[in-house]
Curated annotation (Swiss-Prot):
Species of provenance: Enterobacter sp. (strain 638)
Function (record text): Has no detectable activity with D-mannonate and with a panel of 70 other acid sugars (in vitro), in spite of the conservation of the residues that are expected to be important for catalytic activity and cofactor binding. May have evolved a divergent function.
Annotated keywords: Magnesium, Metal-binding
Family named by the database record: Belongs to the mandelate racemase/muconate lactonizing enzyme family. GalD subfamily.
Residues reported in the UniProt entry to bind Mg(2+): 205, 231, 257
Domain of life: Bacteria
Binding locations of D-arabinonate: 207, 257, 278, 307, 334
GO BP term, pick one: amino acid catabolic process
Source organism phylogeny: Bacteria, Pseudomonadati, Pseudomonadota, Gammaproteobacteria, Enterobacterales
Subunit structure: Homotetramer.
Name listed for the protein in its UniProt record: D-galactonate dehydratase family member Ent638_0932
Length: 399
């Protein structure tokens, strides 16, 4: 097979809307270019440094055909591995290599992987409101667009803002009352079922804001409302408690958007403590490890619901879609609407039609990258306040 030699690797950060999006471009000596998503919204400049200063000199002159070998080399080259910075940098290169391979084969990625398992993947999007009435309006708008799977949040992300029993001169942050949140969430599910019945598939994100005993309690309280799944009911470092949740509730559990290391998901999958894996593909190192994770999940009956937030490039969205179209155990795709400017920077990205996402059909990933327009929207970084979640006494908590 003719070698496809890597000539250059570049990293771009663009902010066409409210998120800093990180894109990696790999160029071969034959002039073929591939693009990948390396977005780490909270640390974009660090990812760019890793790509520019470390991965670029490591990869130039190597054969782009050998994706598995190149991924393994990038993974161990720094000796220390499996962190969010390095994984995202590796992901950008890895996705770009798959993009190149698809172009060389003349196939969209899902065909390169082995073809379709389904015609389209069901999508879900986010509904929220400060009041139940506002939440209903948000749900109604999504139903009108064809969605039948909707993530519902009442008030502040995961719950409502709390001014209860706050200390004098409280530390700045996103204050959060766990007991208030739990009560409001049960009320929300009851109201949603009363209004929409059982045809609407309701998802909810706890966003790891509970203590383990509270997670058990909430899972039991939500069981009568039959949620499609409850996401991140506990943080990764408390995942051993999922056995207790499992023993006391049959609510489907989804976990994984914060995972970086295979050791974080292996036991949960093998012991069947989760129903859905929610890993962020770039956060675990790209397409190459995502395929392996998906096959592990299939062997143990765990379904795929890749993390798909607004702070990922449309290239990453398309990768999720290609994986979902191919992989038999894919369940659903998270989908966040994009601005017109973002679509101009990344032309050809997937869209939702009547509640389903369809993959690009062009060879490779199938999403373009307008460099000139991307550079017209440069990076703008500021500290993220929403991650400074605090309990009513001012204690910092997992966001």
């Amino acid at each position: 097979m003719t070698p496809v030699i890597i000539k250059n690797i570049e990293c771009f950060i663009t902010r066409p809307d409210r998120h800093n999006l990180v894109t990696v471009r790999v160029t071969t000596e034959q002039g073929i270019t591939g693009h990948g998503c390396a977005t780490f919204q909270q640390r974009p400049l660090a990812v760019k440094t890793l790509v520019d200063e470390y991965l670029q000199p490591l990869m130039i002159g190597r054969d782009a055909n050998n994706i598995e070998d190149l991924w393994q080399m990038m993974n161990v080259n720094a000796y220390w591995r499996n962190g969010p910075l390095m994984n995202n940098a590796i992901s950008g290169v890895d996705m770009a290599l798959w993009d190149i391979k698809g172009q060389l084969a003349g196939m969209p990625l899902y065909q390169l992987f082995g073809g379709k398992s389904r015609d389209a993947i069901p999508a879900y999007s986010h509904a929220s409101g400060e009041t139940l009435e506002a939440l209903f309006a948000s749900v109604d708008a999504l139903i009108a667009q064809g969605y039948r799977h909707i993530r519902c949040q009442l008030g502040f992300y995961g719950g409502t803002p709390s001014a209860l029993h706050a200390p004098d001169n409280p530390t700045p942050g996103a204050w959060f009352d766990q007991q208030e949140y739990m009560s409001n969430t049960v009320e929300m599910f009851h109201a949603l079922r009363e209004k929409y019945g059982w045809k609407l598939h309701i998802l909810h994100d706890v966003h790891e804001r509970l203590f383990p005993q509270q997670a058990v309690q909430l899972a039991k309280q939500l069981e009568p409302f039959q949620p499609y799944f409850i996401e991140d009911i506990l943080p990764p470092q408390q995942s051993a408690w999922l056995e207790q949740v499992r023993q006391q509730s049959c609510v489907p559990l989804a976990l994984g958007e914060l995972f970086n290391n295979p050791a974080e998901w292996h036991d949960l999958i093998v012991n069947r403590r989760i129903d859905f894996i929610r890993c962020h593909v770039s956060q675990i190192g790209g397409i190459t490890p995502a395929l392996k994770l998906a096959h592990l999940c299939q062997a143990f009956g765990v379904r795929l619901a890749w993390h798909g937030p607004g702070d990922m490039t449309p290239i990453g969205v398309a990768v999720n879609t290609h994986l979902n179209i191919h992989l038999h155990n894919a369940a659903i795709q998270e989908f966040i609407p994009r601005s017109a400017t973002t679509n101009d920077v990344f032309p050809g990205a997937p869209e939702v039609k009547e509640g389903f996402v369809y993959p690009p059909v062009q060879p490779g990933i199938g999403v373009g990258f307008n460099e000139a327009l991307a550079l017209a929207h440069p990076v703008l970084y500021r500290p993220h306040e929403w991650t400074q979640s605090r309990l009513p006494d001012g204690t910092i908590h997992t966001p």
